[in-house]
From Swiss-Prot:
This is Chromatin-remodeling ATPase INO80. It catalyses: ATP + H2O = ADP + phosphate + H(+). Residues 1656-1672 have a biased composition (Basic residues). It comes from Aspergillus terreus (strain NIH 2624 / FGSC A1156). The lineage of its organism: Eukaryota, Fungi, Dikarya, Ascomycota, Pezizomycotina. Its main location: nucleus. Residues 213-227 have a biased composition (Low complexity). One of its GO terms (molecular function) is ATP hydrolysis activity. ATPase component of the INO80 complex which remodels chromatin by shifting nucleosomes and is involved in DNA repair. A motif (DEAQ box) lies at residues 953-956. It is found in: Nucleus. ATP binds at D843, E844, M845, G846, L847, G848, K849, T850. The DBINO region is involved in binding to DNA.
Length: 1690
């Protein structure tokens, strides 16, 4: 294949040809000899034949030269290795070695690519003797191709070693004939793949031709043997030590980088490469140019000494004895050489095969890409050539289609109108026919009706698109068979005749021959031709007529006859007669003939139609006779089969129902029996647990009483009371001697005998008591071992020797005086400490649980010398209170406050990490006070210490036994635990059970049965008002009595004021009602109930979010969408500041608004030269005007005025206006503003001239005395004397009316859509900028206009104690027309409307006004922090002083805030969050508590109101609770009352009464919440459906599919979590927001997630109402009121 490759060189930045061989380093240099497109793709070379090793290097069997380099190119963009200095110019790398890494892609041209026919797979024949422009040395590699090994076969079989290894001196070589070895084109394949040329420089003369080609191949080797030895540096490595051939695709191998000198030389050679890189136009290089500008530096000429040395060495070699080639001793070397040659040949063949495949594959890919590119280009050309015409054609077609569509629509309308008119005509004709008396007239009307009917049918067919003739379309729905054929091809389009055939048997149709069929076809065709010619068909067929008809029919269908030409007769009379005859014919005869023809046609068509119908009936008779019996048989068989199937189905269904009924009865009876057995088993299990707890309580009580008797000497102390309290009769020998502890799992509750259970309960209870005492005894009896304490790293505590008298008095170190009930509590706590029992002090809030706990620590320190360590854990909000109380009441006990950052806590731990042996009075601390959060964080440090006493304040924080806080606290080493809580029961009985489990984990184990009994019976009693088992209640009280002490205020504290609770009901405002109705219409209560029955967690979360949205509506609608501040679109530049933090208390913010439009003035106009009124060296006119016109020639000069003031001079009027000559001269030099400013404040001395009335007419001034200088009338105008009075109003009618009607206080009705400051004038002159600033910010002018004194002037007035009246003047600018809008168009939301938009806030506004007048102070509690933000705006609007405390308040700020409220009576309101501000703080300065929104946990509200109703409160505390009527808040309040009743029944033991608990008994909390969203009607409907479902034995709301939620339950997200996330936990960083509490986005107005379906109207869609007309009106009114706000589409 000849010619250059059919493609262009590829840029090195393009995609690699071989992706799988891509090198790891992408920054290698580009070697042009390894270009991807210099392979010869079209040829697929044949595989190498197996050759001997000797032939592998022969020129007769050459290998194709490898396209890969002989050596690995240097990495990282280095230059190729240096060439040998003595190498020939043909083998030296030319100046291209110094080219950049990436060469530019060359275009396809004959000057670069080869044009000869040299193939790369055989020996190439050079075309001329010029040296190659392509180096044979280290070729360049493409940066995208894989590196090949350093070994490759050359074109003559010579291994491709580096040039330095193959180049030998050529001095002793015989002269040879120089043959052209390469093509002239350095980029051709022949130039690359041909063998090496002669190693002589170009200037040498060609040598004579060589003898044979074989020695040519062996010439380098022989020359190497005969050449004299060279120095070591220039000597090539011997062939015997040549490296083994490397694999075909090895990893890249690193080589040394060339020196900087060689690299610099290559860079210097770049221009030479540029000169040589442009070949001549004919594609050949000029030898002269190549000789003059060689590619490599000239060879070094040998000196005479070196030449002599070389000759001497060569002579010595010639004189040496020649060895025999066939001599033995080299067999192994020969074999090794042969093996290596074969191996090299095989490796080369294998590598070449791989490369051949890769070249072929790459060529095919390239070819495919070329075809694809050409196809794409062809498509683009076609598109460019034809796109416009196609678009025009399509547009024209669309236009034509649109015209046709319009025509069709017009035709359709005309036809419809025709049908309507013809129908009217038909009805009218039928009506007239019915009324007609004459038969002819009646027939006439009937014909008219028939014509109208036919026209209607025709028009309807045209409308329906039916194009078949009427007479054919009515016979059969199929098209007519024009080709003829048998009658069997007719379609059965009519029902069979009602007449039954008289024949009984089946009738077979006779067969027809081909002749008969052909005759029928001919007859049909002739008939059709006759119909087309409008000829009548004969009654009998005639053969001759048939042929004529056939012939005429075909002729008519095909072509009409040519008329005979007639010659015209030209005559005027003839023409007139002819035209008259034709006129008469057209006027009279043609319509008549037309009517006759139409009538005959209709008659003929009707006859043909009847004939066709009769023929169709006749043709179907044989089918009826043939298929009738078979169809009847099949129908009877099918009917019988259906009846049988229905019978057996019914039978099987009945049997299945009976079987299921029997099975169901058996299952129900089995379930009933199993339920009874399980009930008995649960009863025994519960009885065992209660008995065990009762026995433990009994033993504890007996131990305490025994200790009391031992100490007092009386063993019968309160024996009767004990017997009355505990009615248990436990004999002394009831417990067996060997009875041991029995695990709960090992007990058999199925046995009928309960004696074993009783014994096990008694043994377990006694063992629990013994364990508690042993544990306390072991804690106290720890021996003092300092070394052991040092070794173990734990503390050693002293043991009290005696507890002293049981009647404990107040400790002397306690500075406060304990009350009687507090002293009893101290006795109870000491008794518990003595027995080693933990307890719960559950006194009502405000009774001094803190002081009782402190007194216990003081007692232990004073009486028993136990100084700790004591651990107090409290909420973060009460830590400062604990520290202050301990320091205040017991100064001897040292307190270590443990809170702060991690670094601070690490420093504090040094106080108690030291290994103290004892804790004495001199210890560094005795009590450590910390919070629950820090205990959990530093639990590892607290567990190392043995605490003497651990006090947990507000113990409801550990109400969950599954929390990490509960588990960590349970693992602390302490002798006793004391829980302080004012509300042991908050939500349910399980919380109380968790506290009991915490104080006695061994006894009060977390048994599900006991917990269920605790919760279910009592709560169901509170809900359903049922009778609680008195025995169970007494047993419960007996269980709780030894461990819990609770007193209430009304029983123990008589001097404490009363607490009055009032529920204040509020109504929804119009806006709130619209929001509430919109939310309720978006959800379906029935769907929520059904989903709640399934128990999906996602639905529960959705329901809680809905409750949140409803409560937000009740609080304030602005929680959804705030009224925004509105202003026009201002196009201006505004100054920006980063922060005001570094500014002082007073920040002067200057006017910095600039217009976007700037008008630049030339510098000349702003200078003195361009100003007419500014004098200067460049402006002589201003000086002339000022000197001559303003002074010398001024008419207001005093001299001129003096001369002109006499008699009737020009200035004689000055005497009448009370102006002197000096004043007139001074005013002439002032501007308008200065003159107005000087007149400000001066009284109108001439106002008396305006007086037109006198008390007496006689006192009226005379006419000649009115202009006298002496005042004759000192009376002033009445309207100026006083601002009040009728005269003042009469003189200012418009102003007084405007103010009296309130027009100046209404809000502006409209505002401009956009605003902009004036155009800014700019100039490059600094003086112009200064002048404009002085004009804009002139302080005296601004003070005169706005009457606003500067801050500096006010400070001077205060410092110098001056009278401010002279410095205060009314503003010169008039008052604004609107006091709301004033001088700005910025509209701020109205606070009055902000108050009236919420019913609660409006009621609170009235309440606070009354409380403020009565001198009360208020605690205002909220559930939502965003509502507190809104309340702050309201209090600022009403000018009420307030302070705030919520979950975001810092710990140090909280203490100062509480102290400010307690000590500053001017603070009227204290805003608190229910959770954050309801624990452990004393706010007795307030006597009024207002709950803006209540918590559904009543104990939280009780704690909050007890912040004011506690010890130290001397006034009556009034609690107001704001409740929105008819909303979800009423139902939440009812639920809170139920919880209060549970607490009262359990703790106080009272009976249920006083509260109506006849509410719904729901087991599912989610269903209860869903019921809160329903109104009364919906609740009644749901109750009715529940009752119906219970009557049917179904579960209301359960899924019919029977699918159960089997997935693992997540932690319940309660509404408390959603309301109070982050509150109450000041330092709790782990509390992450749930994302459901108080969303800020206004997009959540609806509050309904996407998963909640919107109810639809109709049957079975629940009670959700759709959008009514009233709702739409509400939405429109809301948008009008709120400024296009609201809930969106409802």
């Amino acid at each position: 294949m000849s010619g250059a490759p059919p493609y262009n060189p590829q840029s090195p930045t393009q995609q690699s040809r071989y992706p799988v061989y891509s090198p790891p380093n992408k920054n290698r240099p580009f070697y042009s000899n390894n270009d991807q497109y210099q392979q010869h793709p079209p040829h697929t070379p044949p595989a190498y034949p197996s050759q001997p090793a000797a032939m592998s290097r022969s020129p007769h069997h050459p290998h194709a030269q490898s396209p890969l380099p002989g050596t690995l190119p240097p990495l990282n963009g280095a230059a190729p290795p240096p060439h040998h200095p003595d190498a020939s110019s043909q083998f030296q790398p030319h100046a291209a070695a110094g080219t950049p890494q990436y060469s530019l892609p060359r275009p396809y041209s004959g000057s670069v690519l080869s044009s000869n026919g040299t193939t790369p797979y055989g020996p190439s024949t050079a075309s001329h003797a010029h040296p190659s422009a392509r180096p044979d040395g280290p070729p360049h590699l493409s940066p995208k191709k894989e590196m090949e090994p350093s070994f490759s076969m050359g074109s003559h079989g010579v291994p491709g070693y580096p040039p330095s290894a193959m180049r030998e001196p050529r001095l002793a070589s015989p002269p040879k004939e120089v043959k052209p070895a390469r093509a002239a084109d350095p980029m051709s394949f022949a130039s690359i793949l041909s063998g090496p040329t002669e190693d002589r420089p170009p200037p040498r003369k060609p040598s004579p031709p060589e003898v044979a080609p074989a020695p040519l191949a062996l010439a380098p080797a022989s020359a190497a043997r005969q050449s004299p030895p060279l120095p070591i540096s220039a000597r090539a490595p011997p062939l015997s030590k040549e490296p083994e051939p490397a694999p075909v695709t090895p990893l890249p191998r690193l080589e040394k980088k060339p020196s900087s000198e060689k690299r610099r030389r290559n860079v210097d050679q770049e221009p030479k490469m540029g000169e040589l890189s442009v070949p001549p136009t004919n594609g050949l290089l000029d030898p002269a140019k190549a000789a003059v500008q060689p590619r490599a530096p000239p060879r070094k000429t040998l000196s005479e000494r070196e030449t002599e040395y070389i000759n001497r060495v060569m002579a010595e070699l010639d004189s040496m004895e020649k060895s025999d080639v066939e001599s033995p001793g080299f067999e192994w070397e020969l074999e090794r050489y042969t093996a290596k040659g074969k191996k090299r040949a095989m490796d080369a063949e294998r590598a070449e095969s791989v490369r051949r495949k890769r070249r072929r594959h790459d060529f095919l890919i390239k070819l495919g890409k070329t075809f694809e590119k050409q196809a794409s280009a062809g498509m683009d050309r076609f598109r460019m050539a034809n796109e416009s015409s196609v678009v025009a054609e399509v547009q024209a077609k669309e236009v034509q289609d649109e015209k046709e569509r319009k025509k069709d629509m017009q035709r359709k309308r005309r036809r419809e109108n025709t049908v309507r008119l013809e129908m009217q005509k038909k009805l009218e004709a039928e009506r007239k026919a019915n009324k007609a008396q004459d038969s002819a007239e009646k027939a006439k009307f009937l014909r008219e009706a028939e014509r109208a009917q036919r026209k209607i049918k025709t028009t309807k067919r045209a409308l329906e698109g039916v194009t078949a003739p009427e007479e054919i379309g009515e016979v059969t729905p199929l098209a007519p068979n024009l080709e003829g054929g048998t009658t069997s091809s007719f379609h059965i389009g009519r029902s069979p005749s009602r007449r039954k055939s008289g024949r009984g048997g089946p009738v077979t149709r006779p067969k027809k021959s081909k002749e008969q069929k052909q005759a029928e076809k001919d007859a049909a065709e002739a008939a059709y031709a006759a119909l087309e010619n409008e000829e009548l068909l004969p009654l009998a067929p005639r053969d001759d007529r048939k042929d004529v008809l056939r012939k005429d029919g075909k002729g008519v269908l095909s072509k009409e006859a040519t008329p005979i030409p007639l010659s015209s007769y030209e005559s005027k009379g003839y023409n007139q007669i002819y035209e008259q005859i034709w006129r008469d014919i057209a006027r009279k005869d043609i319509p008549k003939v037309y009517r006759i023809k139409v009538l005959s046609l209709s008659t003929r068509q009707e006859n043909l139609r009847k004939t066709a119908q009769l023929a169709s009936k006749q043709s179907r008779k044989w089918q009826e006779r043939t298929n009738k019996s078979m169809k009847d048989t099949q129908a009877r068989a099918k009917r019988t089969m259906r009846e049988m199937m229905s019978f057996w189905k019914r039978n099987e269904r009945e049997e299945r129902d009976l079987r299921r009924l029997a099975e169901k009865q058996e299952i129900e009876s089995a379930k009933k029996a199993e339920a009874e057995r399980e009930a008995n088993r649960q009863r025994r299990k519960l009885n065992f647990l209660i008995s065990q707890t009762e026995l433990y309580s009994h033993f504890i009580g007996r131990k305490i009483k025994g200790a009391e008797g031992d100490e007092s000497g009386d063993t019968a102390v309160e024996g009767a009371n004990e017997a009355a309290q505990s009615k248990m009769d436990v004999p002394a020998g009831a417990l067996k001697a060997g009875a041991g502890v029995t695990n709960f799992e090992d007990l058999d509750f199925d046995a009928e005998d309960e004696t074993a259970l009783q014994q096990a309960a008694m043994a377990n209870a006694q063992n629990a008591v013994q364990q508690a005492q042993d544990r306390a005894r072991a804690f106290n009896n720890t021996k003092d071992d300092p070394m052991a304490a040092m070794d173990e790293g734990e503390l050693n505590f002293q043991n009290p020797t005696s507890l002293g008298d049981i009647e404990i008095s107040q400790p002397s170190m306690l500075t406060a005086k304990l009350k009687e009930y507090q002293l009893k509590g101290l006795n109870w706590l000491v008794n518990l400490y003595e027995q080693g029992i933990n307890g719960i002090l559950a006194d009502e809030m405000g009774l001094g649980k803190t002081i009782q706990s402190i007194s216990v620590m003081a007692y232990l320190a004073e009486v028993h010398n136990i100084w700790g360590p004591f651990l107090v854990i409290a909420p973060a909000s009460t830590l400062h209170n604990w520290q202050q109380e301990i320091t205040k009441f017991v100064p001897d006990i040292k307190v270590l406050p443990y809170w702060g950052s991690a670094k601070d806590r690490k420093i504090l731990r040094k106080f108690w990490d030291r290994k103290h042996i004892t804790y004495t009075k001199e210890s560094e601390f005795h009590v450590l006070v910390t919070s629950y959060q820090l205990v959990v964080l530093d639990a590892q440090y607290f567990q190392k210490v043995k605490w003497q006493y651990m006090i947990l304040d507000e113990a409801q924080a550990i109400k969950s036994s599954q929390s990490s806080r509960w588990k960590n606290l349970l693992g602390f080493h302490c002798r006793n635990r004391l829980l302080l809580t004012g509300t042991p029961i908050q939500n349910n009985m399980q919380e109380l059970w968790a506290l009991l489990h915490f104080i006695m984990p061994t006894l009060f184990d977390s048994h599900d049965e006991f917990s269920e009994w605790f919760s279910k019976d009592i709560e169901s009693h509170a809900q359903s008002n049922t009778k609680l088992n008195e025995d169970q209640l007494k047993r419960l009280h007996m269980i709780l009595k030894p461990f819990m002490l609770r007193r209430v205020k009304k029983h123990v504290q008589q001097e404490l004021g009363d607490k009055v609770e009032k529920d204040v009901f509020c109504d929804l405002t119009y806006r709130q009602r619209a929001y509430y109705t919109g939310l309720r219409d978006r959800v379906s209560i029935m769907d929520l109930i059904e989903k709640a029955a399934v128990g999906d967690e996602a639905d529960s979360t959705t329901l809680m979010n809905l409750v949140m949205q409803f409560r937000k509506v009740c609080n304030h609608p602005d929680l959804f969408e705030r009224a925004e501040t509105k202003s026009p679109l201002t196009t201006a530049y505004f100054a920006e500041t980063a922060s005001f933090v570094r500014e002082g208390q007073f920040v002067d913010v200057g006017y910095s608004t600039r217009s976007l439009i700037e008008y630049p003035l030339p510098r000349l106009l702003c200078s003195s030269a361009g100003r007419v009124d500014v004098a200067g060296p460049d402006n002589l006119h201003a000086g002339f005007r000022g000197k001559y016109l303003a002074h010398m020639m001024n008419v207001f000069a005093p001299e001129n005025i003096k001369q002109s003031i006499q008699e009737d001079g020009a200035f004689s009027f000055l005497r009448f206006i009370d102006t002197s000559m000096g004043d007139a001269y001074e005013q002439s030099h002032r501007g308008v503003f200065e003159r107005a400013l000087s007149r400000r404040g001066q009284p109108n001395r001439l106002s008396r001239l305006n007086v037109v009335y006198e008390e007496d007419e006689g006192d009226a001034p005379l006419a000649h005395t009115m202009l006298n200088i002496v005042a004759r009338n000192d009376q002033s105008a009445v309207h100026e004397i006083t601002p009040d009075g009728y005269m003042r109003e009469l003189m200012t009618v418009s102003q007084s009316t405007f103010e009296r009607e309130g027009l100046n206080v209404i809000e502006p009705c409209a505002s401009p859509a956009a605003s902009a400051p004036p155009v800014t004038i700019t100039s490059s002159s600094p003086a112009a900028q200064i002048e404009m600033s002085d004009a804009l910010f002139n302080v005296p002018v601004r003070h005169a206009l706005f009457s606003t004194p500067t801050r500096q002037l006010e400070e001077q007035i205060l410092e110098k104690k001056l009278d401010p009246v002279p410095y205060s003047h009314p503003p010169m600018l008039p008052k604004p027309t609107s006091l709301k809008g004033r001088y700005t168009h910025i509209e701020v939301p109205s606070m009055r409307r902000f108050v009236t938009d919420s019913g609660k806030l409006a009621k609170l506004d009235e309440l606070l006004r009354e409380l403020k007048a009565g001198g009360h102070r208020v605690l205002l509690y909220f559930q939502m922090t965003r509502m507190i933000d809104l309340m702050e705006e309201y209090l600022t609007y009403r000018n009420y002083k307030y302070c705030r405390l919520d979950g975001s308040t810092k710990l140090e700020d909280r203490r100062d805030t509480v102290a400010d409220f307690q000590q500053r009576p001017e603070i009227f309101v204290f805003l608190l969050s229910t959770r954050a501000g309801g624990l452990g703080i004393n706010l007795t300065a307030a006597d009024t508590v207002i709950f803006y929104d209540s918590d559904w946990n009543p104990t939280i509200d009780s704690q909050a109101m007890d912040r004011a109703h506690r010890l130290g409160q001397t006034r009556q505390v009034t609690v107001y609770r704001l409740i929105t009527r008819g909303t979800i808040e009423e139902r939440i309040r009812k639920r809170a009352l139920q919880k209060e009743e549970v607490q009262r029944v359990v703790i106080t033991g009272g009976a249920a009464g006083g509260v109506d608990f006849n509410t719904r008994n729901r087991e599912s909390r989610t269903k209860d919440i869903a019921m809160w969203l329903a109104d009364d009607e919906q609740a009644e409907l749901i109750e009715q459906k529940e009752k119906e479902a219970l009557d049917r034995g179904e579960v209301f709301g359960a899924s019919k599919g029977g699918k159960k939620a089997a997935q693992k339950r997540k932690r319940d997200i309660t509404l408390d979590d959603m309301y109070h996330e982050g509150e109450g936990n000041f330092d709790d960083a782990s509390a992450k927001p749930s994302g459901a509490a108080t969303p800020v986005s206004t997009a959540d107005v609806g509050g309904t997630p996407s998963s909640t379906p919107v109810p639809k109207r109709g049957r079975g869609r629940g009670t959700g109402k759709g959008t009514s007309k009233r709702a739409k009106t509400t939405k429109e009114r809301l948008r009008l009121i709120d400024g296009d706000g609201g809930l969106g589409p409802m």
